[in-house]
Design a protein with these regions (language model features):
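Non-catalytic structural connector segments
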Residues: 45, 136-207, 212
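Histidine-centered active-site/metal-ligand motif
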Residues: 13, 92, 204
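Catalytic nucleotidyl-transfer cores of nucleotide-processing enzymes
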Residues: 85, 101-103, 107-111
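Short acidic/histidine-rich active-site segments
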Residues: 84-96
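Alpha-helix capping and helix-loop boundary segments enriched in small/acidic/polar residues
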Residues: 61-65, 116-119, 139, 172
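Phosphate/diphosphate-binding loops
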Residues: 107, 114-151
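Extended substrate/RNA-proximal surfaces in nucleic-acid metabolism proteins
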Residues: 1-80, 99-104, 143-146, 176-182
Length: 214
C-alpha cells in the first residue's frame, strides 16, 4: 500500500493469490479481502491453465469445465464487488511458434517440464472472444474488449527516456565512424569495394541521421 499511488494492480494469473485462494476454497471473508485489494480481476484462456489437469497438486481441477468454473467465479466476484474483470493472455511470447525460445530458456534453468509449454502467446481480439464464448457473447465482449479498454484508458502514456535520445557529443565522431566503417570494409573486401559500399554508406548515413554517434 505504501507504493500504491499511480499503480493499477490486477489479480494476475493462476499463480496469483486470488486464483490460488479459489483453488483452496478459502472462506468468503478472505476472498473478499483479496478482491478488494485489486483494481481489476483477471481471467486467462483455458489452455494457459490446462497443465493443472495432469498435476496431482490440483485435485479439484479434473476437466476443462473445472477451469471454466474458476473463471466464472472470478467474473461473479467482479460483479459482486464492482471490480472490472479483464481477459488477459499472460503473454510470454508473441506468436505460437515462439514457444521454442521459452522452452530453451526453461530447459537451461533446469525445468523438467520445459517441453510442456502453455500457449502463452498474444491472441487477437477474435481469438480471445472465442476463448471466452462460454461466458456468453455479451460477457465475453465485456471482459475481452470493454473492460480492457477501460483499464487502458486509465494508463498515462509515458516514455522512460527522453524523446531526443540524448546521444553523447564526441568531437569528430562522424569522421571516426566513417573511418572505422571503411577500414573494416577494406579489411574484408580488399581495395576495390563492390556494392557493399552502398550498404556501408547507408548504415553510416542512418547512424548520423538518428544521432547515434560514437
Amino acid at each position: 500500500k505504501k507504493y500504491r499511488d499511480g499503480l493499477l494492480v490486477g489479480s494476475a494469473c493462476e499463480a496469483g493469490e486470488l486464483y490460488q485462494a479459489l483453488l483452496r476454497n478459502v472462506p468468503d471473508q478472505e476472498i473478499a479481502r483479496l478482491v478488494n485489494f485489486y483494481d481489476y480481476l483477471e481471467i486467462q484462456p483455458l489452455g494457459n491453465n490446462a497443465f493443472m489437469l495432469a498435476d496431482e497438486k490440483h485435485d479439484m481441477i479434473n476437466s476443462e469445465e473445472d477451469l471454466k468454473e474458476i473463471n466464472r467465479k472470478i467474473v461473479k466476484l467482479g460483479e459482486q464487488f464492482k471490480k472490472p474483470v479483464v481477459a488477459t493472455c499472460d503473454v510470454h511470447f508473441m506468436d505460437p511458434q515462439d514457444e521454442v525460445y521459452r522452452r530453451i530458456i526453461m530447459a537451461g534453468k533446469g525445468f523438467e517440464d520445459a517441453d510442456n509449454q502453455a500457449p502463452l502467446y498474444l491472441r487477437t481480439t477474435e481469438e480471445m472472444l472465442a476463448e471466452f464464448e462460454y461466458l456468453g457473447s455479451d460477457k465475453a465482449e465485456e471482459v475481452v474488449i470493454t473492460n480492457t479498454n477501460k483499464i487502458a484508458d486509465r494508463i498515462d502514456v509515458m516514455a522512460p527516456v527522453r524523446p531526443d535520445k540524448c546521444p553523447p557529443v564526441i568531437p569528430d565522431s562522424d569522421k571516426t565512424l566513417t573511418d572505422i566503417c571503411y577500414r573494416r570494409a577494406h579489411e574484408l573486401y580488399g581495395d576495390e569495394l563492390p556494392k557493399i559500399v552502398e550498404a556501408v554508406s547507408y548504415t553510416h548515413l542512418r547512424a548520423h541521421e538518428t544521432g547515434r554517434n560514437l
